C-alpha cells in the first residue's frame, strides 16, 4: 500500500507526522507522495481540506484518513495518541471506505470568457469588497430571484456544519446528495425581496448566479480566495467525483455534531 502523510506546520502535528511516518516505514508500507493510495492528514479539518485540494485530480484512486492534533473535527477520526492503533488498522485494511458528495463550480469570467472549474469539499462564497452584491439567481434554467446583500454561500452536506451553519444554514446529513444556498445578510424591504431562507437543491438540479458587471468580487472556495475578476456567471452542481475516507472506524455524524456544538451528553 502506498501512503503519504500530509501535515500542517504546527510543531505538535509535525511530531505526530514524523512518528507515524517512521512507524509506517518500519511496518513495510511504501511512502509515496506522488501517487498515494491513502493520504493521512495530520492536523485538523483545515489540514484535510488542503490535502483534498492537493490530490483532487486523483480522487478515484485515493482514500483519506484524518488524524487530529487539536479539537475534534468533522473529517478526523483518529487522535494523535492513537498512531499505533492506526498502523494496525492499515495492516488489516480490506479497502473499506465511506464517501461524501462534493461541489462542482464553474466560473465564467466576463473580461476574457475564460472558464475555470473547481471542486469544493466544504463551501463556496461570493462577495464584493465593500459594496452590496447584486446577482440574479437561477435554479436550472429558471430565474428564481434577484439577490442584494453581503453575499451568498453554497455548501456541501459536510460543509453545512462549517461557515454555512454560522450564517443560518441548515445542517445536512452527508448521505444527502444535495447542496445548500444560504444568504449572507440579504437586503429585504419594500423595494428588494429575496426568499430570506436557505435553499436545499437535489443532485439533479443546478444553481446559476449571474452577478452585476463589476470587478471587485471576492470568491472563496474552501480555504482559497480569488479576487478582482469580473464574473459573467457561476454554476454550481453536485460533482460526479466524491471524496473517499478509509472506514476502519467512523464516528456517527450526529455524534460529531453534538460534540462540536452542544457538548457531552454525559454532562447534562
Swiss-Prot record:
Pfam families associated with the record: NAD_kinase, NAD_kinase_C
Binding site for NAD(+): 45-46, 122-123, 148, 150, 161-166, 185, 223
Chief place where the protein resides: cytoplasm
Coiled-coil positions: none
Keyword set, alphabetical order: ATP-binding, Cytoplasm, Kinase, NAD, NADP, Nucleotide-binding, Transferase
An example molecular function term from Gene Ontology annotations: ATP binding
GO biological process, one term: NAD metabolic process
EC number(s) from the headed UniProt entry: 2.7.1.23
Gene Ontology cellular component terms for the protein in this record: cytoplasm
Name of protein: NAD kinase
Amino acid at each position: 500500500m502506498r501512503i503519504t502523510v500530509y501535515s500542517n506546520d504546527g510543531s505538535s502535528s509535525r511530531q505526530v507526522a514524523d512518528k507515524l511516518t517512521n512507524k509506517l516505514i518500519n511496518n513495510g508500507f511504501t511512502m509515496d507522495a506522488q501517487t498515494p493510495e491513502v493520504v493521512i492528514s495530520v492536523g485538523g479539518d483545515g489540514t484535510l481540506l488542503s490535502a483534498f485540494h492537493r490530490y483532487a485530480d486523483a480522487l478515484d484512486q485515493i482514500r483519506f484518513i484524518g488524524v487530529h492534533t487539536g479539537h475534534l473535527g468533522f473529517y478526523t477520526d483518529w487522535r494523535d495518541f492513537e498512531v499505533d492503533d492506526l498502523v494496525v488498522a492499515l495492516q488489516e485494511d480490506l479497502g473499506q471506505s465511506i464517501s461524501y458528495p462534493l461541489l462542482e463550480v464553474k466560473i465564467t469570467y466576463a473580461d476574457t470568457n475564460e472558464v475555470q472549474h473547481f471542486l469544493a469539499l466544504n463551501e463556496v462564497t461570493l462577495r464584493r469588497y465593500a459594496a452590496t452584491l447584486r446577482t440574479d439567481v437561477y435554479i436550472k434554467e429558471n430565474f428564481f430571484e434577484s439577490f442584494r446583500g453581503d453575499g451568498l454561500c453554497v455548501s456541501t452536506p459536510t460543509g453545512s456544519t462549517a461557515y454555512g451553519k454560522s450564517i443560518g444554514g441548515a445542517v445536512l446529513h452527508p448521505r444527502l446528495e444535495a447542496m445548500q444556498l444560504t444568504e449572507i445578510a440579504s437586503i429585504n424591504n419594500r423595494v428588494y425581496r429575496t426568499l430570506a431562507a436557505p435553499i436545499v437543491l437535489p443532485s439533479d438540479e443546478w444553481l446559476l448566479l449571474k452577478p452585476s458587471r463589476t470587478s471587485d468580487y471576492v470568491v472563496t472556495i474552501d480555504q482559497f480566495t480569488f479576487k478582482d475578476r469580473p464574473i459573467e456567471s457561476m454554476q454550481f452542481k453536485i460533482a460526479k467525483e466524491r471524496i473517499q475516507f478509509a472506514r476502519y472506524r467512523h464516528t456517527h455524524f450526529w455524534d460529531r455534531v453534538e460534540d462540536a456544538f452542544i457538548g457531552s451528553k454525559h454532562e447534562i
